[in-house]
């Protein structure tokens, strides 16, 4: 427990632990660790020591109401070997997170290399004529993930302090499009699920193979 709590405290603001332990009910576990609420125990350990963690799940606003004037949009930049990354987050003055977006700005040389490797691999298949082109092209940015937290209510009953119904997600997407355009990208893709495609269509995205895509307006 102490090891896990120490490791979680070392995580940065863009990190999220999706699962700390597998979702198996305690009666079904015949041997070994039976603490199925391990995340809760780790977070209680951190709180009991008067410490904090920047990990996303620990900072969620959850069911709390959030005042609009208490939110600010932050952009964190970092680099990988193949992309320039932008982590956008809506945060309160206490550091709680109401929503975030992960934006990737792929390097042109990385896209070229991956495209060549993809073509080389698919050229060896018997069904080459049915192979789709590499799904990401030069000049295309990628929204990898969007999440907005807060109490979920029916739209007609949405409270003014409800994070999920104040357009925070839309503002994140539009800000990501602005950042991508300023960085010189002409198009932006988004990884979407079946249930969210309608939402992205309303934001100007259209279906385009594996992803949905939106043309970007040049920024002066």
Q: Residue locations for each model-derived region?
A:
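Flexible glycine/acidic-rich beta-alpha junction loops that bind and position SAM and/or redox cofactors
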Residues: 1, 16-40, 148-159
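Single conserved hydrophobic/aromatic residue that forms the stacking wall/gate
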Residues: 2-9, 13
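Conserved GNAT acetyl-CoA-binding A-motif
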Residues: 178-192
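Conserved active-site alpha-helix within GNAT-family acetyltransferase domains
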Residues: 192-211
């Amino acid at each position: 427990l102490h090891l896990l709590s120490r490791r979680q405290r070392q995580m940065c603001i863009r990190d999220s632990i999706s699962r700390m332990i597998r979702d198996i009910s305690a009666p079904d576990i015949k041997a070994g660790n039976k603490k199925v609420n391990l995340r809760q125990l780790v977070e209680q350990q951190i709180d009991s020591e008067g410490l904090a963690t920047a990990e996303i799940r620990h900072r969620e606003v959850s069911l709390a109401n959030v005042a609009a004037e208490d939110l600010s949009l932050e952009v964190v930049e970092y680099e990988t070997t193949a992309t320039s990354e932008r982590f956008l987050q809506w945060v309160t003055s206490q550091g709680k997170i109401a929503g975030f977006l992960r934006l990737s700005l792929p390097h042109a040389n990385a896209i070229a290399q991956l495209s060549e490797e993809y073509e080389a691999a698919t050229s060896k298949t018997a069904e080459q004529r049915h192979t789709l082109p590499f799904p990401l092209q030069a000049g295309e940015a990628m929204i990898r993930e969007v999440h907005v937290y807060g109490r979920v209510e029916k739209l007609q009953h949405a409270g003014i302090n409800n994070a999920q119904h104040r357009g925070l997600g839309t503002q994140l997407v539009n800000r990501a499009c602005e950042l991508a355009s300023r960085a010189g990208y002409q198009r932006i893709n988004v990884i979407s699920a079946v249930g969210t495609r309608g939402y992205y269509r309303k934001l100007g995205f259209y279906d385009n193979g594996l992803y949905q895509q939106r043309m970007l307006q040049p920024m002066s």
